[in-house]
């Protein structure tokens, strides 16, 4: 550890609170990471604290008075109760915390710009036509500047005027201690895994987080007026592996400590080379198969392994058993004659999604993303929010809904014959 005189040494690496990783991207956005819009965002201790905490509450404001308070050069949250009455809560500087804001807006208060994830999209243009359901100022994360650097999540973010407005139609209420609280239109949902983010992890229960960071059971639908029941024994404190859903994109929170136990990209590359060094062969063409470099994630290579998803037999690409009368991608496996989808295999390159450092022996179905057995087993159990009131398991590397009984398959490679 550092000795006290090193604490303020300028060359000391900045403290990392954790990282947010967007589900559905395999290491980077399709057209590359740019500025505040990327697939992974690291939260570091700021040179100067920018956190805020609630202070003065103004009750029974007229709209004009509320506007005057909101126009002051400090943060505030306005709760519109009726056309004649607004409650404004002023927020004051908190020197003990750092604030990070996430949303769809590209305005300067947003630290991490997140847009809707389209399953399996290969370019940002695929996402442009979609009507976004992510809030412009979706949520904020407040991190304590001193150990253990606790991170807490709150619904809604402050806009360029340092305000959060909850209009007449937003769900809002007065709490038992006389404070105000509310929910955003489509809500911010959080799920904390049981047993942390490890090979023993199990899914937790999805909850909704309020503007003040309280925890509620889910509403009947995403934007219903009626809030769920308050869950007093749970908190808005993020833990390693917590999932944050913004209604259009889901983020994985990894703590700095958790990431230190996660396989590195270098480790995943070594596993790729190890598989290729074993020279797996296509049982039909006897040609050697090889997983392409991790930098090439969307163009099928001629040596690329393909798999029959019903049985797991790995082949090179060939036309054997391709009968025209069959629908779509269904093919008959030459090894065992089972009929099912036949897809190329892709290595999962986003190391933050792995729950262990095991070899890439299993693939998600139907997309063909390959990773460790424990990682496929974990993600296949996680019900991810989809639309306004449904949930389904999806591949973390591309966001495709999983298919089949398990949602993943064990790969059966044929070794070289020599």
Curated annotation (Swiss-Prot):
Keyword Electron transport: no
Residues annotated with Phosphoserine modification: 121
UniProt region (Ring-like domain), positions on chain: 311-399
The keyword Transcription regulation is annotated on this UniProt entry: no
EC number assigned by the record: 2.3.2.27
Localization: Chromosome
GO BP terms in the entry: DNA repair; negative regulation of necroptotic process; negative regulation of T cell activation; negative regulation of T cell proliferation; negative regulation of TORC1 signaling; positive regulation of B cell activation; positive regulation of B cell proliferation; positive regulation of canonical NF-kappaB signal transduction
Pathway it works in: Protein modification; protein ubiquitination
Sites bearing Phosphothreonine, chain numbering: 127
SUBUNIT field: Interacts with MAP3K7. Upon IL1B treatment, forms a complex with TRAF6, IRAK1, IRAK4 and MYD88; this complex recruits MAP3K7/TAK1, TAB1 and TAB2 to mediate NF-kappa-B activation. Direct binding of SMAD6 to PELI1 prevents the complex formation and hence negatively regulates IL1R-TLR signaling and eventually NF-kappa-B-mediated gene expression. Interacts (via atypical FHA domain) with RIPK3. Binds preferentially to the 'Thr-182' phosphorylated form of RIPK3. Interacts with RIPK1.
Family indicated by similarity: Belongs to the pellino family.
Entry protein name: E3 ubiquitin-protein ligase pellino homolog 1
């Amino acid at each position: 550890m550092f000795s006290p005189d090193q604490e303020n040494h300028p060359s000391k690496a900045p403290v990392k609170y954790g990282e947010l990783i967007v589900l559905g991207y395999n290491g980077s956005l399709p057209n590359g990471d740019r500025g505040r819009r990327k697939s992974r965002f690291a939260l570091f201790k700021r040179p100067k604290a920018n956190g805020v905490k609630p202070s003065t509450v103004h009750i029974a404001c007229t709209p004009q008075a509320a506007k005057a308070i909101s126009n002051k050069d400090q943060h505030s949250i306005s709760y519109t109760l009726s056309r004649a009455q607004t409650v404004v809560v002023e927020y004051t500087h908190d020197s003990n915390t750092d604030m990070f804001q996430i949303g769809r807006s590209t305005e300067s208060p947003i630290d991490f710009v997140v847009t809707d994830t389209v399953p399996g999209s290969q370019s940002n243009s695929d996402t442009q036509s979609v009507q976004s359901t992510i809030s412009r100022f979706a949520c904020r994360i407040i991190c304590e500047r001193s150990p253990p650097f606790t991170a807490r999540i709150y619904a809604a973010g402050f806009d360029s005027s340092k305000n959060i407005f909850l209009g007449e139609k937003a769900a809002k209420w007065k709490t038992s201690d006389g404070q105000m609280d509310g929910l955003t239109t489509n809500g911010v949902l959080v799920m904390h895994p049981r047993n942390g983010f490890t090979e023993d992890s199990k899914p937790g229960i999805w909850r909704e987080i309020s503007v003040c960071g309280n925890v509620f059971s889910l509403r009947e639908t995403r934007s219903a007026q009626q809030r769920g029941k308050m869950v007093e024994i749970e908190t808005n404190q993020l833990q390693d592996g917590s999932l944050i859903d913004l209604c259009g994109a889901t983020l994985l929170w990894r703590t700095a400590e958790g990431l230190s136990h996660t396989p590195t990209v270098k480790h995943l590359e070594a596993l790729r080379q190890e598989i290729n060094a074993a020279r797996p062969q296509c049982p039909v063409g006897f040609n050697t198969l090889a997983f392409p470099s991790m930098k090439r994630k969307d163009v099928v290579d001629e040596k690329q392994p393909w798999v029959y998803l019903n049985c797991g037999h790995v082949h090179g690409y060939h036309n054997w058993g391709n009968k025209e009368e069959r629908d779509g991608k269904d093919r008959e496996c030459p090894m065992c004659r089972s009929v099912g989808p036949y897809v190329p295999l892709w290595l999962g390159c986003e190391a933050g999604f792995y729950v262990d450092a095991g070899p890439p022996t299993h693939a998600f179905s139907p997309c063909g993303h390959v990773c460790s057995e424990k990682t496929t087993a974990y993600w296949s159990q996680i019900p991810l929010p989809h639309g306004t009131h449904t949930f389904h398991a999806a591949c973390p590397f591309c966001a495709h809904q999983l298919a089949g009984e398990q949602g993943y398959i064990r790969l059966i490679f044929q070794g070289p014959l020599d």
